[in-house]
Amino acid sequence: MALFESCTSEQKNVLKKQILKLEKGITKLNHWVREYEFASITYEIEFFKTVKPNLVSNYLYLNLLLRLLQEVPNIAFNDLTVYKKYSKEAYTFLKEENYFYNYLLNNDSCNDELYFRRLETTLNYYSPNHLFSDIKSTCSHGLLTAKIKAYEMWLIFCNNKIQTIKKQYLINQKSLDSSPLVWEAHKVDAIELVYALYFGGAVN
């Protein structure tokens, strides 16, 4: 992921190609799992709770990076407010899904059989979008798990950018403080400048 986290616009095409590869990989995985018979419920849960969400979360995360490249002009890549806005968006999402987010953070498993088995088995239509899902290749909370993982990565990226920008600002500030402006022209020139400013109304 580090290749894309410098966020230069030249990387946009490379990023799109990587997203397309992941998209094709996810499609193939869905086709494969439709007909696959898991050896046990434990393996089925592991696939839908860990394996597939890890792949989908990378896909979603790269799409967040692409969105940044598309929305933010080059001149604003080091604007603190940009990354504060995006991180706030991520925090808002995680807050809205607070119950399930804590379920994952605490490594809970009490509802795994409901959350992470095929929809065909559980019929747990957590989201209206599941009405249009392939019940053999999806579970009720797999996509939500992937989104949470993607936003966690996104928060790390945004916070790293914020810290980098702040550090660079402090370095620049120290550089200015250690290099005070020194008048190197003749004193007469300085006096003429003061008079010019005074009579021009710039100073009182």
Feature map (PLM): residue ranges:
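Basic amphipathic recognition helices
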Residues: 170-203
